[in-house]
């Protein structure tokens, strides 16, 4: 059935593929980034057990300094260094020379991811909507996350992996949204043109802008009021996943 092109009411285009963001689109994070402190505490505890002598307050402060520095360094390139890079750089700030592949860095990232997963839940509508869209379209996932292994685990945990023909995670390919490159990789893997694809995501500055800059139509899933970027306008706005069945399938 792939290759069938359907007319999308309100978007005015033919669609072969639907691409999705992951976080706060298909799966939901507890609001306010409440996961950060408990995740950092787990990471810090792992490091302390392995001989690192740093107070949690100092560790937390330096972690955010390093994280912000990494994003500043990659603002133009839109690269996404793996989370291991952050851990390694934090440790070096305190005089501990562990490279990104060392067991203590990899292990620390792992415990951070384990805790993070506790703050993620599946959207109640996700499985049914994906199942129904899968009958007519190629599906792809394009996610920004510095721990790609965690994304794969979440997809397996919630039974999402099977729905997608391509899955791209920024931390795995070292490129993040809104870079057109990550969208283009997804399109190439699916074998579809940008004009025949729709992207669904919750962040105007990343999902909508990245899709539009690549020539893909964008549907913003607005779960809560967000600051709209004036020069980035989605083609459609929905409040929940089930509305996609009307936007995309009601032809």
Where do the language-model regions lie?
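Asp-based, Mg2+/Mn2+-dependent phosphohydrolase catalytic module
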Residues: 2-18, 28-30, 34, 50, ...
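Conserved phosphoryl-transfer catalytic core
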Residues: 23, 35-74
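A short, structure-level motif marking secondary-structure boundaries and short turns
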Residues: 28-30, 71-73, 113-116, 136-137, ...
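Short acidic alpha-helix initiation/capping motifs at coil-to-helix transition points
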Residues: 34-43, 80-91, 145-146
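Charged catalytic carboxylate motif
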Residues: 39-42, 86, 125, 129, ...
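Residue-level preference for well-ordered alpha-helical positions
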Residues: 44, 48, 91-92, 187
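A metal-dependent, Asp-based hydrolase signature
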Residues: 57-110
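Short, acidic loop-to-helix structural element flanking the phosphoryl-transfer center
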Residues: 77-85, 100-104, 110-139
């Amino acid at each position: 059935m792939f290759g069938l092109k359907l007319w999308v009411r309100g978007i005015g285009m033919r669609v072969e593929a639907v691409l999705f963001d992951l976080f706060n689109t298909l799966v939901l994070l507890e609001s306010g980034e409440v996961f950060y402190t408990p995740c950092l505490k787990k990471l810090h505890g792992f490091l302390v057990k392995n001989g690192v002598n740093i107070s949690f307050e100092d560790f937390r402060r330096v972690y955010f300094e390093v994280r912000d520095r990494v994003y500043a360094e990659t603002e133009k390139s839109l690269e996404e260094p793996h989370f291991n890079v952050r851990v390694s750089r934090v440790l070096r700030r305190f005089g501990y020379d562990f490279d990104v592949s060392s067991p203590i860095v990899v292990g620390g990232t792992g415990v951070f991811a384990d805790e993070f997963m506790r703050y993620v839940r599946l959207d109640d509508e996700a499985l049914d909507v994906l199942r129904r869209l899968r009958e007519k379209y190629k599906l792809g996932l394009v996610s920004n996350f510095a721990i790609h292994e965690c994304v794969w685990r979440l997809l397996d945990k919630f039974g999402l992996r099977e729905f997608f023909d391509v899955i791209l995670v920024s931390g795995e390919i070292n490129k993040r949204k809104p870079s057109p490159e990550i969208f283009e990789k997804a399109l190439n893997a699916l074998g579809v043109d940008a004009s025949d694809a729709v992207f669904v995501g919750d962040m105007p500055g990343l999902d909508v802008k990245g899709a539009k800059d690549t020539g893909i139509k964008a549907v913003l899933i607005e779960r809560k009021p967000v600051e709209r970027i004036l020069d980035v306008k989605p083609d459609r706005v929905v409040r929940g996943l089930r509305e996609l069945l009307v936007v995309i399938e009601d032809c």
